[in-house]
């Protein structure tokens, strides 16, 4: 005989499950992420910037109109021609009385082949640019491997913000000899969530510099934005009314927020998932979520590159996507260059653009930031770009897999996947 309390508990669980099934994936992800502390606002515009040229043209145009402050937070500024153009523009704005603050990661700087050196930093400071290094790498190095600042945030006058996957480097426009063209994604946000991105920047700026930057002047008010009329417009009907939430991963504070979002987004899917990520080393939870989505009848498409900028990690990626392919995931292998984009689209209803990779560094260690965009029109724009890139990709099958990877390479992939928790 089942006790009445047990029956009530079972009925309640059933009702909750039925309610979840009837709830759209977009409203479900908003509800679940709000429970984890993510705030959403409804008054945003979002413009996708789909190439390096488009990103830098738009961002430079916005900086050129700045009146009060320009804040930049990047993993690295590669010391090349695009950085020279940026620093010249920032110095010009500083001479006009605009507060210019720039932050870069010490490991990110040292790990690129054209780092900013002390003499460069001195010269920039002499030109009025406040620039600081987050956690400089020093002997014995080990303590500085983890908890890097991998975010890419720019906020101008507290009214316009940029975020996504691109740092500052020529190769986002010109590509490289090793990987060819460099494909990536950025976006410009206007609206309430600019305040969230500004708060993220100011918090880490004050931590690094031990300053006390604060005040209403750094946050979006009711001022006219007419002086930013030179930027690429948001052509969606939903412009100015898009729901956006910012996921901010801080070590020891919000450790699980990025993996939680991706897991919940995949689990909430009912019809389709389109995913691009350059370092798809994944963890067990995400692999299971993707498998279960396929079992539910969700069309799951994943795109990764045949080229990469680092060793070993791509071998792990290829091993993973081959396993996923055998489990029913449609895998596209992008060929023209390196797809460094970090996006997911779910059910055509919501998407994310940001800095987070799906590897151990982003999910377990680094400072990261992604924008959740709950808007069908923006998601459709991103989805159309995904479909366009399929024309430059081949679909992974048993036959194409054997042509793509030699037995030796397959073994390296198997070995690399054992190292996934550290890649």
Regions found by a protein language model. Give the residues of each.
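Charged, low-complexity intrinsically disordered terminal segments
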Residues: 20-423
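Bacterial N-terminal signal peptides that target proteins for export
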Residues: 1-11
């Amino acid at each position: 005989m089942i006790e009445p309390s047990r029956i009530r508990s079972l009925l309640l669980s059933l009702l909750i499950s039925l309610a979840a099934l009837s709830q759209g994936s977009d409203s479900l992800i908003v509800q679940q992420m709000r429970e984890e502390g993510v705030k959403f606002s409804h008054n945003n515009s979002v413009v996708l910037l789909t190439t390096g040229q488009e990103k830098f043209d738009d961002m430079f145009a916005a900086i050129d109109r700045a009146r009060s402050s320009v804040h930049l937070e990047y993993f690295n500024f590669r010391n090349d021609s695009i950085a020279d153009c940026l620093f010249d523009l920032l110095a010009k704005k500083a001479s006009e009385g605009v507060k210019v603050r720039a932050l870069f990661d010490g490991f990110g700087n040292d790990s690129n082949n054209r780092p900013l050196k002390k003499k460069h930093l001195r010269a920039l400071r002499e030109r009025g640019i406040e620039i600081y290094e987050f956690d400089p790498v020093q002997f014995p190095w080990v303590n500085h491997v983890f908890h890097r600042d991998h975010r890419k945030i720019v906020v101008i006058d507290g009214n316009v913000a940029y975020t996504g996957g691109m740092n500052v480097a020529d190769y986002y426009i010109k590509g490289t000899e090793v990987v060819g063209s460099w494909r990536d994604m950025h976006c410009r946000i206007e609206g309430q969530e600019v305040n969230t991105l500004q708060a993220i920047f100011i918090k880490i700026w004050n931590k690094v510099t031990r300053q006390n930057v604060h005040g209403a002047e750094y946050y979006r008010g009711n001022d006219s934005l007419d002086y930013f009329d030179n930027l690429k417009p948001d052509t969606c009907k939903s412009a100015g009314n898009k729901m956006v939430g910012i996921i901010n991963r801080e070590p020891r504070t919000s450790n699980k927020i990025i993996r939680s979002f991706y897991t919940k987004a995949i689990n909430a899917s009912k019809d389709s998932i389109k995913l691009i990520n350059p370092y798809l080393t994944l963890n067990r939870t995400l692999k299971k979520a993707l498998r279960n989505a396929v079992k539910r009848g969700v069309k799951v498409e994943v795109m990764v590159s045949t080229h990469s900028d680092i060793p070993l990690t791509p071998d792990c990626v290829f091993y993973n996507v081959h396993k996923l392919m055998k489990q029913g995931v449609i895998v596209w292998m992008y060929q023209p260059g390196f797809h460094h984009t970090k996006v997911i689209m779910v059910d055509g209803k919501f998407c994310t653009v940001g800095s987070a990779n799906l590897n151990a560094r982003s999910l377990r260690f680094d400072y990261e930031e992604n924008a959740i965009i709950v808007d069908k029109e923006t998601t459709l724009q991103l989805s159309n770009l995904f479909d366009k890139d399929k024309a430059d990709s081949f679909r992974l099958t048993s036959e194409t897999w054997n042509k793509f990877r030699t037995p030796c390479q397959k073994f390296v992939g198997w070995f690399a996947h054992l190292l996934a928790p550290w890649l």
